[in-house]
């Protein structure tokens, strides 16, 4: 018993430490009941008003709402994230968020940190290095910005990526049972969180991972282990996806009727192919913008912040020197701190 406790106590201490750190990092939320003005969360609550009202009055969920885009399936914007076999995933999900809920900054910071810590343990790092990596990952500039804006589902899926990769690594280390179980669990949680875009990107990462480790294992005469592990990986992924299949299939069916599929409106006998590339990638990072993950404000700053907001700035003095308020107001829009 002492031996077992001696092995697990550092990890219990780390979990407790990360929880305390997350609570203190967002102390105003936890001690003063203050709330971050997460714009996306507020927008979501507004979109869900009709659905929540119906649920409160009728005691059951409504499957359609008229409040969005002249009508759409309600499960696209509210609920519908669980499935019949979700007891264990829900328990893990809740534990990773300190039971505070997915929109809580504290819970999201803890989830990101503990997820990376689990991956580091799967790669057999000492708990001290794993803790350092967990803190660095959790405090990534991108995560703090995403949490502040309210991209909570995206952050939660990103928090689940490291343990999914760690579970895959266990499979290729010959730990078939544990690796399969964890892979199925974390894939399940990813899909259940309902941000398919990030899970789609993860699929590419997983493919490169398998190809890379496959080349190494074949060269080192571990082809049999590689084949078994890859087969179990595929089976585990299927097991993780299957409980969420109703949600995925209905989303696929619905997407074909939106601007993300081919348009039903014809012009000059031609059918449009949905949204154009510039619109689809309008909020995606360019190559240089990706460097903001490592160097904050490398391209200036947020596009909604302007140099003229500082009354002592050179920009403000230059506009005041114009002695033309209309021209100054027009030029003020060109003083955005973002220049990417």
Over which residues does each language-model region extend?
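Membrane-interface coil-to-helix junctions
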Residues: 21-113, 135-158, 271-340
């Amino acid at each position: 018993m002492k031996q077992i406790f001696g092995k697990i106590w550092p990890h219990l201490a780390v979990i407790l430490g990360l929880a305390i750190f997350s609570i203190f990092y967002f102390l105003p939320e936890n001690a003063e009941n203050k709330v971050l003005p997460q714009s996306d969360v507020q927008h979501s609550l507004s979109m869900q008003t009709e659905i929540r009202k119906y649920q409160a009055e009728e005691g059951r969920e409504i499957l359609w709402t008229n409040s969005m885009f002249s009508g759409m399936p309600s499960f696209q914007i509210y609920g519908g994230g669980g499935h019949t076999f979700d007891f264990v995933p829900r328990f893990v999900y809740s534990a990773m968020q300190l039971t505070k809920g997915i929109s809580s900054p504290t819970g999201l910071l803890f989830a990101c940190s503990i997820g990376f810590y689990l991956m580091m343990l799967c790669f057999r790092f000492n708990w001290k290095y794993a803790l350092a990596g967990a803190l660095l990952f959790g405090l990534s500039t991108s995560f703090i910005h995403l949490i502040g804006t309210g991209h909570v589902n995206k952050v939660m899926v990103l928090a689940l990526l490291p343990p999914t990769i760690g579970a895959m690594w266990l499979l290729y280390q010959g730990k078939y049972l544990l690796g399969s179980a964890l892979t199925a669990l974390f894939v399940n949680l990813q899909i259940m969180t309902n941000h398919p875009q990030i899970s789609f990107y993860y699929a590419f990462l997983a493919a490169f991972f398998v190809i890379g480790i496959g080349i190494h294992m074949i060269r080192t005469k571990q082809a049999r282990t590689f084949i078994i592990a890859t087969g179990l990986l595929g089976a585990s992924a299927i097991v993780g996806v299957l409980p969420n299949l109703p949600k995925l299939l209905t989303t696929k069916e619905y997407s074909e009727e939106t601007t993300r599929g081919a348009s039903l409106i014809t012009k000059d006998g031609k059918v449009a192919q949905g949204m154009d590339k510039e619109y689809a990638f309008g909020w995606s990072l360019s190559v240089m913008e990706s460097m903001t993950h490592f160097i904050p404000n490398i391209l200036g700053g947020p596009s909604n912040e302007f140099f003229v907001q500082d009354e002592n700035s050179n920009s403000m003095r230059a506009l005041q020197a114009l002695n033309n308020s209309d021209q100054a107001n027009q030029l003020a829009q060109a003083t955005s701190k973002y220049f990417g």
